Amino acid sequence: MSWVAAAFVSAFFAGVTSVLAKCGIKQTDSDVATAIRTCVVLVFAWAMAGISGSIGTIGSIEPRSWLFLVLSGLATGASWICYFKALGIGDVNKVVPVDKMSAVLAALIAIVLFGETSNLAVKLVGTAVITLGTFLMIEKKQSAGPERQQDRTWLAYALGAAVFAALASILAKVGIEGVESNLATAIRTCVVLVMAWAIVAAKGKMGQAVHVDRYELVFLAASGIATGTSWLLCYYAIATGQVSVVVQIDKLSIVVSVLFARLAFNEKLSRRSAIGLALIVLGTAALAVWK
């Protein structure tokens, strides 16, 4: 398989992840779902670390890097928990675009904290375009009472997922020096796993984890496998191809999510949302090309 093909297949699996996950949380509690899914993802994370040959370097990681790995893992865990809560309440074609705002937040924070001002005009325009596109995709429904409160709840969780994802990226950049990226991902996933199951236990939901519907369990496992497969293919594409191109292709996962949400849940895009989606794709592509 060529690296370009691997990048496209990686984007495909990344896109279907959210749809598969939503199929697995119709009855299953989102906290329980996150914990179960993380078990599957952890296997792939360490497989990637093994393939890259970086596991042997774990003993040379500095204490400061360990601290930031743990903090980044906690932020990642919080992002995943918020994301799955949002998916359980809101539509895929609304939750995914808001979650992608993490790229905007990370870019803006990097400009302020790290002085990443190369191609500053493009970065500012790109972030503005993505923000506008996201706003267009979040269409307010004319509802009242519980339905209106539900609309606000999914948005709050989706924004939380974006903020924590951006924080995880910044923490990784600040403190994780000299740690191979795949090994760092594996270690952070361990932190996420501990955090996810700790939350399940603290909320008294361990019993629910034992009695998860088999049908939904299959979808949760499939979601984890899709994420892991996407990671492996993306790693292969980056290792054998051009990183800048792979990153651009990966951004197309949002299109896959929207298309499959239409097929699986009949989530239709209005003209306004379609324009918003196009703007998000253009904005993310611009940020990827002109770093």
Please describe what each predicted stretch is:
Residues M1-F8, V104-V163, S270-K291:
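Juxtamembrane helix-loop boundary signature in multi-pass membrane transporters
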Residues F13, L20, V40, A75-T76, ...:
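Hydrophobic residues within membrane-embedded alpha-helical segments of Major Facilitator Superfamily
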Residues C39-A45, V98-V112, V191-M195, S230, ...:
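Alpha-helical transmembrane segments of compact multi-pass small-molecule transporters, enriched
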